[in-house]
Each structure stands twice: as structure tokens, then as C-alpha cells.
Amino acid sequence: MTKKLFLILSIAALVLSGCKDDITHVGSGLLTPSDSIVVVADTFPLTSDIVNSEAIVSNPDSMLLGELETDFGTFKADILTQLACPEGYAYPDNAKVDSIALFFQYNSWVGDGSSPLAISVYELDGEVLNYNRSYTTDIDLSRYCSKTKPVLRNKRLVVASEKMDSVQNASGDYVPMVRMMSDSTSDFFRRFAAIRSFTTQEDFNQQFKGLFIETDFGSSTVINVADIAMAVYYHFSYDKAGRDTTVNDMKVFYANSEVRMVNRVQYIDKEDLENQLRAQQAEHNFIISPAGIHTTIDLPIKQMEQTIYSHMVETELEDGTILYKRPYVNLAQLRIDVENVFSGSSSDMKRNDWLQPAPVMMLVKDASFERFFAKNELPDDTCAIVGSLTQGTDSLGNPVYYYSYDLATLLTKELRKDDVPETLKMRLVPVSVTTATTSSTTVISSVKQSQSVSATVIRSAQSGMSLQLVYSGF
């Protein structure tokens, strides 16, 4: 049976290898025109532009802190955060607060790690941040903080690469940390020390609304803050076998997922930056985060429909009605070439190399952009497609970098609509992706608009970006 099957396949292969029919009409010598399968390859030109999203929803995995100045713009990032209350905890009756310290741990930085930045911290004294509300990076600080209630004794000068307050984690690795002492004579210290018990988070938020953390010196470093905590050191005494015994203890208040944290990002002269970038569109487009500057790509859907259906004529009836084959887009490969990947040593980095391309870029329908993130949707082949920065080689063996997207399913659906638009506008957006693994399958479980610092320079549509299509009909 196996030998017989092999013989049949071998004969079929010989027949196919001897066939000289045009690939656009495979098998046309065997089928009538109405029964033939049509396969066509085409390339369609595109247009691209940059768009300013003004602000993005602040929902980062880590918080940015600092200021950075490059040709991709100058921005300053600071943090508004609540602290989680240890619900149900109360200090011992005779406890006395000795000191309060603020800590934050950072896992990386962007820019010049040897350049100093000065950190200031203030108490939030305006509106209470709402845990159930989404905030954008252009949050109005004046509604939440007057900057009249400093928390620290002095500004804290930090050099990111020196890791002055590093601690060892469970794996034995040193984790960079910054320790800042509160001013024990401040109104903040007196009021916080007077809070003796902690009932609910809501009650605590009314007594202590949170912290505003900013830098007011340095424009060459932005720190990726991973964790923020405030430690209250206190002592109390008790009688033990007739002897007065003193115990030193501490209670830690964390900024975590149980409270609201907002990253405010301010771009200086952003409109001028947008104009400068748009002036370069003959060769390049840009996607810059957290600026919210994205690139849009217009797909010529109407032109595609007309071209595709010109190859799909099945038959013409006596009354002049034309019957068409049902079209399928088998392959629609969009490649986005990236042109600013730095591959040298860190010592050779220039200021404009600090911002590197986003590792993950999503191509989403522009009309669905806001809804996608507001409703925490997941990518699918008909609305949003995720691509990773990929390395390849050119014909000379030199490294090239790109994102790749297969739009076959999306275009098949769009081309079958009754009213096909002239163009379909798509948007390139940097995203952070979370995955989940079930048995042997890994799936995307969440997608958030990335707030990490990145700048992606791509070849523009005017500089040769195109869409390659292979489509068929039967």
C-alpha cells in the first residue's frame, strides 16, 4: 500500500513539474475557465504619516523618574502614588515613631548613568486619587499636589550607576535602591506619626493621600523605578518580669497594585518636535514612547479590491452581469524596516543612541486604537497584530532589523465588505505584552500601551515601504 501511494505521488510530481501554465492560472489546461483556480501576486504602494496621541493611559509595569534630552525630544517624568495601608494594624499603646524613610528600587535606567539627578518628594494634599479611574500621562498635578509640603529633610542626589544603597535579593544579586529620610520636624512627620491605627484603605487615603516624587536637577537620566515603599521606624516598651523592655520595630507601606500609581510625563515643545519629525518623512517615520508619537500607514483597500476583482472574473451572463470568483488573500506581508538599532559597545553610545527601538510593536486599526486599550482587548488577525523586533541579514550578509505583519485575514475580511473604503488606516504602537501558558500553548493574556522609553526610526512609505500580496479565487 505504501509503495503504491508513493508511486501515485511520484507521478503527480512529474506531471506538476512538467506543467508550463502561468502561475496565475494553475491547472487551466485541465479546467474550464469557470472552474479554474486563480493565483496572483501583486505589490501595492502605501502612504505613511506620524500622529501625535497627546497622552497615553498611565498603567506602566515600572515608573519613569527623571529628565532626558535627545533629538527625539526632551521629557520629564515624575510619580504620583498612594501607599497601601496595613489594614487592621495598630501600633502598641506606648509606641513612638523615631523616623520615616522612603525607598525605591530601580532595575535599569536610560541615558547617562553617571549623570546626577536630584530627587524631591512632596505630600499629596489635593484631590484623592481614585483607584477605579484611569489616568493619563498628562495628569493635572495642581489638582492633587501644591508642592508646599516637602517630605524629605533635603533633596536626595542620585547617580544611577553608583547604586549607593544596593541590597542583596534572595538570589544574591545586588538590587539598586535609593533611601531617603523624612524631615522629623515637618508637618508630614508629625501628622503621619499621629496615625495610631489603620482600619481601611479608604480611611487611610483620607488621612494620607500619597506622595509626589520628582527630579529638579539633571537632564541626562531617566530611572525605571520598580518598587516604592515607605518604612516607619518606631519603638515601644513593655514590662517583662518586672523589667522595662524596649523593642525596636518597623512597619512598611508599599506602593503596589492595591493602590493608584500615576506616571506624569511632560514633553517640552512637543509641537516643535512633531514638526521636525514630519519634515523627515521623505525617508523616515518615527514611533516615540512615552511621547505618544506614532506612525500611521494607509492601506489602499479600494485599489486592492479593483485589482483583485479584475483577476476574479468567472463568467459574463447574457444580460451583462459579471460573476466573480470568491477572493481569498493568502499572504499579505508587511515588513517595517527599522533603522536605528545600536549594536556597538555602551562606551560608544551617543546621546541619540540612548533611545532604542521598541522590542514589541502592535499594528492596530486606527479607528479601533482608543477602544482597544480602554477595553483591554486582545490582538486578533482582524483588528490588531503584534510583531517583535527581528534581526535578519541582507544580500551582503549585513544585519537588518524589522517588524513583520501578515495581514491576510484582516484584508480578506475588509475586501468582502459591501462598502470598501478608499483606504484603511493602521497605526504602529509600542506595547508591553503578558503571556500565559496552558499545557503546551502560550497565548497573549494582556496588552498595554508601552510607557517604556523608546524611539523607533522606520523607513517611510515614501522611501520604499510596500505591501506584498498573494491572493486567489475559485
What function would you assign to each model-found segment?
Residues 2-9, 13, 18-474:
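Secreted, disulfide-rich extracellular signaling modules
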